[in-house]
Amino acid sequence: MTRIKLKSAVLMSALFVVLPFSVHALDGAELYKTKTCLTCHGKDGKTTIMPSYPKIAGQNEAYTLQQLKDIKSGARANGMSAAMKGIMHLVSDEEMAALAAYIATMEP
């Protein structure tokens, strides 16, 4: 009985250590700030620093995710995507998914 309690305690302790980092890493709103998306696309996803930059607020989640993947891989290398290419190596697949989900919830 003691071994089971000990194993349970160790497992729960591990969850309390790992879980906050996982949740934080997948927080799309926080990532939008820390990965500097807001610098070019604006805090609201609509107020861009240049008129030619896309307004991304409310964009379809699947579309946004695919665009992020294409920019990262180099499959999309037209227009302003070259500016993002230098940043995308810092964004994991999981973070891209969280960002796409967050952007889709922004008011267009």
Regions found by a protein language model. Name each.
Residues 2-11:
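Bacterial N-terminal signal peptides that target proteins for export
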Residues 16-33, 47-52:
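Electrostatic cytochrome c docking/interface patches
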Residues 34-35, 80:
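N-terminal (or domain-start) structured segment
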Residues 35-36, 44, 60, 95:
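Short pre-active-site segment immediately N-terminal to redox-active cysteine/selenocysteine motifs
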Residues 36-43, 99, 103:
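The canonical Cys-X-X-Cys-His
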Residues 49-57, 72-106:
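Axial heme c-ligation environment in periplasmic c-type cytochrome domains
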